[in-house]
Amino acid sequence: MSFADHSVIVVTPVYEDVEASSRLFLELSAQFAGRIFVVAVDDGSVKNPLDIDSLQQAGLEGVILQLRRNVGHQRAIAIGLGYVSERIESHQRVVVMDSDGEDLPVTIPELLQGLEQEQVDVVVAQRKSRVETLKFKLFYAIYKRFFSLMTGRAISFG
């Protein structure tokens, strides 16, 4: 099968976390079998770079885009989306997922269902809860309040 033969393309950034991304790949394979093509963007991992074996061992087709240096989570996603944009066909859908275990493959069908509505091009998930330390939650709440005071806008995600 080739890129065009898959109905769903998953773009995921990975940085020094082969273990978590391998779990994601296994979950994707179990849930979607041959319908998923993975574009994993290794964001400059030095100690433990991702390789194609991680996908193959999970029974998935895909590519690993190896970046020479760490460019950050958002830029790695943008690079993955750029790769997809040059190859995507009208029947395919793209899902962006973190590879750290926070985003669950079981939510993909619900997201894709949202794209079936007319005039909808993008569906965004809102995380119901984070798995973070109390210290992180406290400082993030302070940041969100400060952001709201300075801009007049609330951050409703994260």
Region roles according to the model:
Residues 35-45, 65-66:
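Short beta-strand/loop segment that forms part of the nucleotide-sugar
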Residues 51, 59-77, 87:
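Active-site-proximal specificity loops/subdomain of glycosyltransferases
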Residues 32-33, 57-59, 83-92:
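Alpha-helix termini
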Residues 12-14, 42:
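Short beta-strand/turn micro-motifs composed of small residues
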Residues 16-30, 48:
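Short, well-formed alpha-helical segments that are part of the catalytic scaffolds
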Residues 68-69, 73-83, 93-96, 105-158:
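Acceptor/aglycone-binding surface of glycosyltransferases and processive sugar-polymer synthases
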Residues 7-9, 37:
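Cell-envelope/extracellular polymer assembly enzymes that use nucleotide-activated donors
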Residues 42-52, 101-102:
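A conserved acidic beta->alpha catalytic loop
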